[in-house]
Amino acid sequence: MTAPENDAAVAGFLAGDCRMEEAEEKTEEEADVGAPRLARTKTDAGETGVALDGPAGASTSVALTSQFVAAAGKAKAEVLGAPRLSYRGTEVSFGRAEASDLFALLSTSPEGVSTEGIIDTLWAGNGDRGSRLLESAVRQLNQVMRQASGVGAGVKFVVKVRQRRQLAAAYFDVDLWRFEAAFVRTGTVEGRAARLTALQEMLALYRGPLLDGRDDLWVLPLRRAAQRQAVDAAEQFAELARTEDPDRAVDVLRLAVERVDPHSEVLWCLLMSIQGELGRLPAVRRSFELLKERMAEIDAVPSAQARQVYERLIG
């Protein structure tokens, strides 16, 4: 709590001669707006889960896993966050930049990319050399994966289907593909529990910005699209959970403004609103202070709408 917040809270409580309530609310604030206390749990699938300690000390598990387990016999391709390819726990490295570039591009689409599209995206302006770079990248990627998996020379990990190159789904399990599939399910499944499950899977898979660390121009719109989907997932999850399990909604939103988009006023305003519904006014104040700090990072300030939400809650 900042000094001005502390003075305001103390003055309000003393005016009502409620010293005990002051202590209780301060404890609640520290539990609610501080960094989430994470405890590791094991899921049935062998994944590492995340349990968040609620204000009362009880563990409210939101089962947001830090990683996914690849299907048996498949390489695990993680591109939500820093890109990483592994097979049975061993990291797979590419010998050449063009193979790494091709893998990054193909990992963004299970349907693959046309030959012309690959060359225009990765090696535009190279003329005939672009075609040679593509074939070299395909050979390198196939070779690296054969060595990692121990399969025969006839196995192709990059296949050509109707003039489109794609990662063979039989051999790759890509977190972005799962993320997109879960996104589709959020709009097709019936029932609150099924929607929460799909939204939860999206948030668990989203470790960070798509292909984090790559500054290629072609990545940027795809990165923004994935981030928007994750923000929407957090918002929908919180709205579905706020009535029956508001603490869970708060936990998810706090993780979302850390992991997904620290500058999303939609998430911050929803977080403050639910904190306000729970009567946690110091938490609302702290959330607004954090919002101001995050916006300052990009030389901005909270919008008039965000300030209105805050002022309405504080009264």
What does each model-identified segment do?
Residues 85, 118, 141, 202, ...:
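Conserved RecA-like P-loop NTPase ATPase core
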